[in-house]
């Protein structure tokens, strides 16, 4: 638990429940959920909202049939999503123990729909507080894969996952936001094989959990435990491409590329960049070595022109092809520069005002998991239609396909780090959190759309801001660092990173820029409107200012953006984030209702004022 007492936490939630109509106070901002593992219970009473994609998800024999890894695509793979056996609740074994052999499942088991969290409606389980989660399914290896290695891949499992094949432990992974996989070839047999996944997820403060809470309410939401992204098998060679690290170097008209292959002896790499199907650059070299792929006269990626180059990478040994993958990349730069004496974020050498919504990434039917791939894309498409050019992904890491759509649609992304509350005071939790954050940065470093890493939010589980800013800079010197979003909720500002970030509800307000730090408004707005029939909890009034009509909330939104236009011109404000894309459980702040069925604001009117702010008109 955090150093903050349960009594103080309860008082903070009482304050949140009052839904203040003035600027948010530090007391609200530092409120945290009480996170003690508890008995298995049904989710708190609420309306079981469906989305336009719920029926499709329920009927799909294999949910999310799309290839899950757009920047490392292989043509052969086997999707393991769908119905699995499930064993959870009080009788399930402790998944932390991870014995060498999988336990015997009961004769009668429940069924769970993968990859939806067990707390979600779409999973078919829909229970809260199941700490030990055991999954089982059978599979057969296609005959065409004979003679090759077989890897099993997981998009994400929250929080500690142990994998078994045919009863034998394969490996373990900790961290609910990063992908992982194992070579399972030695354990396979002809015909039917058995896969068991054990997940331990107490949803407690000693691990990264974002805005999940065992006692959801106000600005914290229902947890998402266990498997919540796609599971799949793929055949590979003994030597194969494991990862591509790509960094555009616009000033030198090249892509810095490293092809991770693990085994490197005798391996040669060829990478080819294509523009509209035509080869524009080629490089050959060794695996696991830094390569420079020419991209002459690059067409630069931006929200106005989100152009992406195709990339084909081939791995050879003694002239023979041993692996080949398809990928893509965008050419863009992001840096801090002075414009008329004001520090500004420069995209491709030009100041672009960054404006977008706070995006929580929750769904009433799937929680952390969107019901379908089309739904995953929908939120970003609508963000673009609203005239925004960026999105702040709030304290959650999305599947790779979400970033793929941000890349394709042209949305700048601020990526938050999921916090662990206890990292503030517990050094062991802090060390584990830092490891997970390094894995997140490493996993996402090739995504074109990500321009800013956000380390801490409103002092939640925070520690050593300046050191962490330096650490993120060392991990990735090519992006902007926001060491602490909402510095007005911290005891003090250590001055790290590239941004000085204020939160103001309903606002807006602007911080004073510094010679080395850009002034941004990391959160504001939170304008609320009830839409009967589309509310997760009909009695909710959350949060910050509740309007009584669509006309009133639209007028308030436009007035707030007009103020931002003045702050851009007079106070050097360079970015702003409005809360939020959609309603989330008790929160009623969205452009859409939580079920994505009702637009709460006038999108045409919003788009016009948003574009005027971005364009400086």
Indicate where each model-derived feature is located.
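Substrate-binding/catalytic cleft of secreted carbohydrate-active enzymes
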Residues: 380-381, 390-605, 609
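Extended carbohydrate-recognition surfaces in non-catalytic/accessory domains of CAZymes
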Residues: 36-153, 208-220, 224-227, 236-237, ...
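Bacterial N-terminal signal peptides that target proteins for export
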Residues: 2-14
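Beta-strand-rich binding/interaction modules
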Residues: 165, 253-285
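Bacterial N-terminal signal peptides
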Residues: 11-26
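Accessory beta-strand-rich segments of carbohydrate-active enzymes
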Residues: 87-89, 125-126, 130-240, 264, ...
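Surface beta-strand/loop "capping" patches
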Residues: 235-264, 344, 614-617
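N-terminal carbohydrate-binding accessory modules
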Residues: 244-246, 312-383, 612
């Amino acid at each position: 638990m955090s150093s903050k007492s349960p009594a103080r936490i309860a008082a903070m939630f009482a304050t949140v429940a009052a839904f203040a109509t003035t600027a948010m106070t530090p007391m609200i901002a530092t409120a945290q959920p009480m996170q003690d593992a508890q008995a298995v219970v049904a989710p708190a009473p609420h309306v079981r909202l469906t989305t336009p994609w719920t029926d499709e998800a329920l009927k799909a024999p294999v949910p999310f049939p799309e290839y899950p890894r757009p920047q490392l695509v292989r043509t052969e793979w086997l999707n393991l999503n769908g119905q699995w056996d499930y064993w959870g609740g009080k009788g399930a074994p402790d998944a932390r123990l991870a014995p060498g052999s999988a336990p015997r499942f009961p004769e009668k088991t429940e069924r769970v729909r993968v990859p939806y969290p067990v707390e979600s409606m779409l999973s078919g389980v829909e229970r809260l507080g199941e700490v030990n989660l055991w999954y089982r399914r059978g599979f057969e290896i296609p005959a065409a894969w004979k003679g090759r290695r077989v890897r099993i891949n997981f998009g994400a499992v929250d929080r500690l996952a142990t994998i078994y094949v045919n009863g034998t432990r394969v490996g373990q992974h900790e961290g609910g936001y990063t992908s992982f996989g194992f070579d399972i070839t030695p354990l396979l047999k002809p015909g039917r094989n058995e896969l068991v996944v054990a997940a331990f997820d107490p949803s407690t403060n000693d691990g990264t959990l974002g805005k999940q809470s065992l006692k959801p309410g106000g600005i914290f939401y229902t947890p998402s435990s266990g498997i919540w992204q796609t599971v799949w098998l793929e055949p590979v060679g003994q030597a194969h491409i494991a990862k591509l690290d790509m960094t555009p170097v616009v000033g030198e008209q090249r892509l810095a590329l490293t092809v991770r292959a693990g085994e490197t002896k005798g391996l040669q790499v060829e990478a080819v960049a294509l523009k509209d199907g035509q080869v524009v650059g080629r490089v050959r070299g060794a695996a696991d070595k830094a390569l420079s792929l020419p991209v002459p006269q690059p067409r630069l990626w931006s929200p106005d022109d989100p152009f992406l180059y195709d990339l084909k990478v081939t791995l050879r040994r003694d002239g023979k092809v041993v692996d080949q993958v398809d990928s893509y990349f965008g050419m863009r730069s992001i840096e801090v520069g002075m414009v008329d004496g004001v520090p500004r974020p420069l995209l491709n050498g030009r100041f672009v005002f960054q404006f977008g919504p706070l995006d929580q990434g929750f769904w009433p039917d799937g929680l952390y998991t969107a019901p379908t791939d089309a739904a995953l894309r929908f939120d970003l498409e609508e963000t673009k239609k609203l005239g925004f050019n960026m999105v702040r992904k709030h304290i959650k890491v999305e599947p790779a396909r979400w970033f793929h759509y941000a890349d394709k649609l042209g949305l700048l992304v601020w990526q938050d780090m999921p916090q662990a509350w206890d990292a503030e005071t517990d050094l062991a939790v802090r060390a584990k959190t830092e490891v997970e954050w390094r894995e997140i940065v490493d996993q996402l470093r090739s995504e074109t759309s990500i321009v800013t890493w956000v380390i801490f939010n409103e002092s939640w589980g925070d520690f050593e801001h300046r050191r962490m800013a330096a650490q993120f800079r060392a991990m990735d010197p090519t992006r902007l660092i926001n060491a602490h979003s909402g510095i007005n909720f911290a005891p003090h500002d250590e001055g790290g990173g590239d941004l000085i970030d204020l939160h103001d509800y309903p606002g807006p307000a602007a911080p004073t820029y510094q010679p080395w730090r850009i002034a941004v408004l990391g959160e504001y707005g939170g304008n609320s409107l009830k839409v009967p029939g589309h509310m997760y909890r009909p009695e909710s009034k959350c949060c910050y200012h509740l309007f009584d009509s669509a006309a009133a909330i639209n007028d308030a939104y436009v007035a707030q953006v007009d103020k931002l236009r003045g702050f851009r011109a007079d106070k050097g404000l360079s970015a702003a984030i409005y809360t939020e894309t959609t309603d989330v459980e008790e929160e009623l702040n969205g452009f859409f209702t939580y079920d994505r069925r009702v637009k709460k604001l006038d999108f045409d009117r919003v788009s016009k004022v948003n574009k005027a702010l971005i364009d400086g008109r």
